[in-house]
Amino acid sequence: MDYQLRSTGQEGVEVIAQGQIIASLHFFLYYALDNLISQGIEILGRRILLSFQGGSFLEADVQDLQELLVLKLTWHFAKEGNYRLLYTIGYDDHAKENQVFIPALWYKDNEAGEGMFPSFRQSSNWSFLETRMSVPCGIQLSNGQWCLNCCASPAKEKSGLASMTWDRHGTTVCIPGCEWPYSYRGKKELKSMDSQCKPTKHQEANSTYTRSLYILSEKQNDSLKSYEHFLRSMESQFDHPKVRLSWDDYGLYKLTHLLSLIRKDPKGNAYLVMGEGNGEVQEVYEFTAGSFLVKAVEAAYAFARCPFLDNGFKPLIKERERISTLFSLPNDDKLLAKLASLMGRYYLQGEKRPGVFQDCIDLKTGICGGYLGISEHPEFKELVNSRCNGEAMKSYVLLYQALRKQGMIEDAFLELPQRVARFYCDCQLSNGSFGRWWTLGGRPTDTKGTNGAYIGSFFCYLLPLLDSDSVLYADVRSALYRALPFYGNQIEEGQFYGDTLDADSCDKEAAIALLSFFLDAYSLENDERLLDLAIKAARFILTWIWQMNSYLSEDSPLGKYHFCTSGMTSVSIAHHHLDFYGMAIAVDFLRLSQFSHDPYYRRTAYKMMDACRQLIATEEAPLGRGPSFIGWQPEQVNHTTWEYFDRESLMNGHFAIDIAWVNVLGFDAYLTLREQGALPCNE
């Protein structure tokens, strides 16, 4: 990139390219409470020197990697003491007010949904620690014509943790940093920070401190397209997770723990418990469900096509023997397929009337509901949810096919999806939406969000199995074509919110649902317009993928396990923890890479896949639990100052919660990748 550097006043520098100020930076240094006055700035080629009162100075080496500017910032401290380091970044936005986007943290002012999470409604000004973002201090300012993207290298020690704040024309980074006016600590806690003192960083005389700053500033009216360009330009600067478990071992451990969660009902059928061993909050997990948060029908589909895995692995052999004895089944190569059949039969009870399916079951009371877990709205238990129905019915279609390949015909597993399809064909809204929450009589109570995209994916899998001359085939096909413009418009408008059921906010799963739907539709229709929309959904997913290894205390549980945040995904604006959803995203990113001939999505898929092979309980590292939990992998990886249940002791480097969906999603994705030959054989 052809650019020049120009000083502005005593403490600033502008980066100019093609006559445009693409970045404007100012640097400040505080000693104790005093602002050290800048003594002047000198530009020597691609090197910037900024001197401060008292002899300290900042040295910035500037290099460009094509469109990406990289500034290596080194502060030199003349005397011992406590310092605060600040810099600001802006650009010539022609006085236009910018939209602010912070990856995995701030999207469209966080005005979608309800909850305690930070939003413009609560305050117009915020400061966040770098560990809350998928790239440290990552932010984008965009005015409809221009996008300024920037981030920093991660802190290597607690005293260097930075925070970032902004206004509509620029951003300020402070080292060390603090959060204000509130700190979001859990789903129900937004802690006031009024009484805190500004932190400082102690430096010895003649010592140095170095951080890197990354900037991509470009003419672009598409915010997410520009951010993706930023990530691509920085790929060589990013970390890759360290692999600690082979793919063969991953499959063995996942299957072992999944089988340990299987129980038998009084009728002899099988179900999957939601989670175990979760201490003071275990009561929250006394459920089972065919779909969301348990994914039991998807687990059945995985069992139905699982090859005979044991490799002499004693914990798995023990679980197979337990299943064989519990259900009086031969312990042979059909054991898991027969178990899958018993599981499929169990969840058929969720059909309350023809096509009306409520698959969440309270194991203590036996009550069935649309969703019985944690949520902002207890009335969900009385309703029917399109995400739950779409997930479960797609899995029933796949389960039916997988069992049929083994000579096991379970007609009920296809008949139920057909009745549910009829329900949604009849209820589909005039704009093409499949809605979100429905009454048992088919009346919509909530139509917001992306839950209906799961019905779209379900229809894509059901359609090829229907008689092309049948009325249902015609209706499903027609409903599908009416849905595509509606959900395509959600992508175009960036309406990625309201997908997860245990919170109400912008979330990554909204984009995952839309990506899957449009890839499924593209597989049916081979229409490039559908692929273009899938790519746009994928761009939003990229914003939730951690690209660098955030700071973790070496003394924390995550630090002791040498956990890497790179390649992990965070959940939503309302959930500030990391999870292992990346295995499922990887399956779709590999599809997207194949369809679009873009290897970037393939590389990103493998980054997520490798990240998901860590923090799995083994005999040597049981993750704080006993032998019966071999293979468990926590749902909540609390890398920052947040914990689902507001428990301070489990923030900043802790992990918690055994929940079925983590194992189901990971194992099913593992089998899919294995079947596709996408798992490197030497790992």
Predicted segments, located by residue:
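Non-catalytic carbohydrate-binding regions of carbohydrate-active enzymes
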Residues: 471, 480-502, 525, 529-655, ...
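Active-site lining segments of carbohydrate-active enzymes
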Residues: 370-383, 394-474, 523, 535-545
